Amino acid sequence: MAKFEKVKIAGQELNIKFGFNALAVFEKESGESISGLGNYGENIPIRVAICLVYAGLKDGARISKSEFKLTKEDVADLLDEDGQALNRVMKVFSDMMGDKKKAVRK
């Protein structure tokens, strides 16, 4: 089974994964290229951040065979409730993308 993480957002433990499928969902939902994310640094636009979290949660649910009913608006509401959630999600994103870079170099 593919690797996913659990992340706590607004008191809920949610499955999250940033693989190729999540990145494709992100690009489709946001209209942004994944390669452009690095250009934002710490100033990622809210719309882009919501789409990134949404894509990771959607793919985490898919991989873990869990039901996924959240909309992007629901994700935004969860982020409103938990001021540190975006930081936790971005850490998972960085860790998972770092794992992919290491695997490619081997």
Regions from the language model: what does each represent?
Residues 1-10, 24, 28-47, 64-106:
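Charged interaction scaffolds used for protein-protein
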Residues 12-14:
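Well-ordered beta-strand scaffold positions
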Residues 19:
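Residue-level signal for threonine
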Residues 48-59, 91:
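Short, hydrophobic/amphipathic alpha-helical patches that form generic packing surfaces
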